A protein has these predicted regions:
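Transmembrane helix boundary and interhelical loop/hinge segments in multi-pass membrane proteins
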Residues: 91-111, 125
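Secretory targeting signals
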Residues: 33, 122-180, 184
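Aromatic- and glycine-rich beta-strand/loop motifs that create alpha-glucan
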Residues: 1-26, 285
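Terminal transmembrane helical anchor/hairpin motif
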Residues: 6, 14, 31-71, 192-285
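Hydrophobic/aromatic residues in alpha-helical transmembrane segments
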Residues: 87-94, 142, 177-178, 224, ...
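Short alpha-helical transmembrane interface motifs in multi-pass membrane proteins
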Residues: 76, 88-91, 127, 131, ...
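Long, hydrophobic alpha-helical segments
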Residues: 73-100, 197
Length: 285
């Protein structure tokens, strides 16, 4: 009963950020599709024609696929605005789990409650995962509203974009787990946020090097962001990958990428729980 009350408290604390984030994603998705409807098809072809050679190495699909309405809308799931909104949720909620509570003085009250320390970590992860799912759903819902209200030539099916929304949700869970892990080691909320941002930037640089470096696929595989390819999952939903030690066994990327991200998020959260259960809690300054 006490755990359920804590879950409700966590939802109450996060409800404004979650509501505003969902509204932004729904509105931006509609706006993005509306702007696409204003662009002449020939302009996309001209942009791709004059794009530098390294651009093709940075995109996970063929340029021809980007000329279709589905390819153009798929850019939405890689756009900086949805990424920033989802990162804001992941880093904001993840940093609050331990370090944020210590800094605000709430941790002393929670530790003195009948709940065990492990239970104190369960409520935040319920809110974080639920919020990540709702954010992905909000972006997909905005896509559906846009396709339903904006006139496009040869409009794609809205269900084609579900893999992209799921991949974005998985990335949000992964980033939240990484942030929570850093938060479990600290007592100031801002340091976990900056730390998680630094980890993400390094992962992005490693992925970029792997994409541009000839034969650098193994370098890209060192970055967890290599598993974030919503555009590829939207345009090539049945693309597969052969396992290194089992060359005859192929796994569809839409399952593999999301599994990697969610697993990384859950394992980092589990490590954060282990650290929090065993650490001494400092007095808030």
């Amino acid at each position: 009963m006490a755990l359920l009350s804590l879950v409700r408290f966590e939802f109450k604390e996060a409800r404004f950020q979650l509501a505003i984030s969902c509204i932004i994603l729904i509105s931006f998705a509609w706006l993005f599709i509306w702007l696409i409807s204003l662009i002449k098809p020939g302009l996309w072809a001209a942009v791709l024609e004059f794009a530098p050679d390294f651009f093709q190495k940075l995109i996970a699909v063929s340029p021809a696929q980007l000329l279709t309405p589905r390819g153009q809308i798929s850019v939405l799931y890689l756009h900086i605005v949805p990424l920033l909104v989802c990162m804001g949720w992941a880093l904001g909620r993840g940093s609050q789990v331990v370090a944020g509570r210590i800094a605000s003085g709430h941790m002393e009250l929670l530790v003195a409650s009948p709940l065990r320390r492990l239970e104190l970590m369960i409520a935040p992860v319920v809110v974080i995962v639920t919020g990540a799912v709702l954010l992905g759903l909000a972006l997909w819902l905005g896509t559906w509203i846009g396709l339903s209200t904006v006139r496009l030539s040869n409009p794609p099916e809205v269900f084609d974009f579900i893999p992209g929304a799921v991949n974005l949700t998985a990335l949000t869970i992964c980033l939240a787990g990484i942030t929570t892990l850093i938060s479990s080691l600290d007592q100031d909320r801002w340091r976990p946020i900056w730390g998680a941002m630094a980890v993400t930037i390094v992962a992005a640089i490693v992925k970029l090097i792997g994409q541009l470096l000839p034969g650098g696929g193994w370098v890209a595989n060192l970055s967890f962001l290599t598993a974030f390819e919503p555009q590829k999952l939207i345009l090539e939903p049945h693309a597969s990958w052969n396992l290194p030690f089992f060359p005859h066994l192929a796994v569809e990327l839409r399952f593999w990428f999301n599994l990697v991200l969610v697993f990384l998020g859950m394992i980092t959260y589990a490590i954060a729980c282990w650290i929090f259960v065993r650490r001494d809690l400092p007095v808030p300054r």
